[in-house]
């Protein structure tokens, strides 16, 4: 039986501490749309998305009204387009991206992901077509998101893909305002198939025909809970985070089950990730500072983040039988008001953020760098992050934005959930010769599991 104080606590979490469901994401297979004619394929994709997702937004709104739980985004993820379009006789997949964009707008969702390729061991012709289509596709669509998986613990890092993605990010930044197209492009190592968060979501080939995945949020709730244990031991800190994560995940489970029932689509997973926003009171950085750091980014930050990430998982696992996605704590610089501030103050650098990615979800996320940064330097940043993921058997990623005509200390405004970011310093050295070697970095010895 529910107690009055538990009901009031939940209301307080939603009204005062920015607790919300960050996204309901419909994962959708497009395998049955395959066709040699790219025009016919685009039409099939449009028809399938609009038919399957026609009630997604309405369902989310109904759940919001019924339970009083804010659901910030409704999204769609689809099978990686390089697989779906492999039989097409064409040179570019721009028309497919436009069909995805049009369909997503028709059903009213915020983003659609899956304009993606999986090239961790090598390229197919279709993979290369998709990657070469990325700059114009991101420039000519509004809500299409893309991802490319360039490495894995099992197979190593495809350095040819790393080089190509550095060049692709650079080109995309030059043909989209303030490099904004790069905010819709993620480069992964060890990408997961059931991620509900953008821009890296795609519907994996091992997934069902269609599925509902939910991503929760709630850093403000965790910070409020930690205020009650100031000065206490780390055991109490971890226990407090675990209990809070359980409550947050339970809410996500409720929303996922309800959406699944209303849409008659199987429930997939709840992603436990703490996802910040630029709003005050909704920051992962402030959670770390609440543990006793004067500034997010100072010494001790990586340890605090490791504790947070692990405790979130332990608490969330007890609240749902199906936990998946990325599940941890996100550190997107432009989307976290504390990290924006500490980047301006010099406490958060790319090097420190890279260290933090060793112990949390994903990687270098929503980081703005000078527009003059070379493609090979971007590739070097991707390679470093991929190496962390490969060696540690975890998902890492890079979503980095070279901003044309901006330099260190300038500010770029993206707006909405994407926030704003100071232009961060990159190393003045170069890695041109390293990146130009090509080939594949071999998988680590612990990849041999059999």
From Swiss-Prot:
User: Do you know which InterPro entries this protein is assigned to?
Assistant: UPF0210
Q: Name one Pfam family in it.
A: DUF711
So what family is this one in? Answer: Belongs to the UPF0210 family.
- NCBIfam families cross-referenced by the UniProt entry: PRK05313.1
Question: How does this polypeptide assemble, per the annotation?
Answer: Homodimer.
This chain belongs to the protein called UPF0210 protein CPE1497
């Amino acid at each position: 039986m529910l107690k009055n104080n538990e009901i009031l606590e939940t209301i307080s979490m939603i009204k005062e501490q920015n607790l919300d469901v960050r996204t309901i994401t419909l994962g959708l297979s497009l395998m049955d749309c395959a066709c040699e004619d790219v025009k016919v394929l685009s039409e099939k994709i449009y028809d399938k998305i609009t038919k399957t997702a026609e009630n997604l937004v309405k369902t989310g709104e109904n759940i919001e009204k019924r339970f009083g739980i804010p659901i910030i985004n409704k999204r769609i993820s689809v099978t990686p387009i390089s697989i779906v379009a492999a039989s097409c006789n064409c040179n570019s997949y721009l028309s497919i991206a436009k069909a995805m964009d049009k369909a997503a707008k028709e059903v009213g969702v915020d983003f659609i992901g899956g304009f993606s390729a999986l090239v961790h061991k090598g390229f197919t012709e279709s993979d290369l077509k998709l990657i070469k289509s990325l700059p114009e596709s991101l420039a000519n669509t509004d809500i299409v998101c893309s991802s490319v998986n360039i490495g894995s613990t099992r197979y190593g890092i495809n350095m040819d893909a790393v080089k190509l993605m550095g060049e692709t990010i650079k080109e995309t930044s030059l043909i989209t305002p303030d490099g904004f197209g790069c905010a819709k492009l993620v480069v992964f190592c060890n990408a997961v198939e059931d991620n509900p968060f953008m821009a890296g979501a795609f519907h994996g080939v091992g997934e069902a025909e269609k599925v509902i995945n939910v991503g929760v949020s709630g850093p403000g709730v965790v910070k409020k809970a930690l205020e009650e244990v100031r000065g206490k031991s780390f055991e109490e800190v971890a226990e407090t985070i675990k209990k809070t994560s359980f409550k947050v995940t339970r809410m996500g489970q409720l929303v996922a089950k309800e959406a699944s029932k209303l849409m008659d689509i199987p429930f997939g997973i709840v992603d436990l990730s703490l996802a910040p926003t630029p709003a005050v009171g909704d920051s992962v950085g402030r959670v770390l500072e609440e543990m006793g750091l004067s500034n997010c980014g100072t010494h001790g930050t990586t340890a605090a983040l490791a504790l947070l990430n692990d405790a979130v998982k332990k608490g969330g696992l007890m609240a749902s039988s199906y936990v998946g996605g990325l599940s941890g704590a996100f550190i997107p610089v432009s989307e976290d008001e504390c990290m924006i501030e500490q980047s301006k103050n010099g406490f958060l650098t790319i090097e420190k953020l890279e260290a933090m990615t060793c112990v949390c979800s994903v990687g270098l996320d929503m980081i703005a760098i000078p527009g003059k940064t070379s493609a090979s330097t971007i590739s070097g940043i991707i390679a470093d992050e991929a190496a962390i993921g490969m060696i540690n058997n975890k998902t890492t990623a890079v979503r980095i934005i070279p901003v044309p005509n901006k330099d260190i200390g300038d500010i770029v405004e993206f707006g909405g959930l994407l926030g704003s970011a100071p232009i961060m310093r990159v190393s003045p050295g170069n890695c041109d010769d390293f990146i130009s070697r090509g080939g594949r970095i071999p998988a680590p010895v612990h990849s041999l599991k059999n």
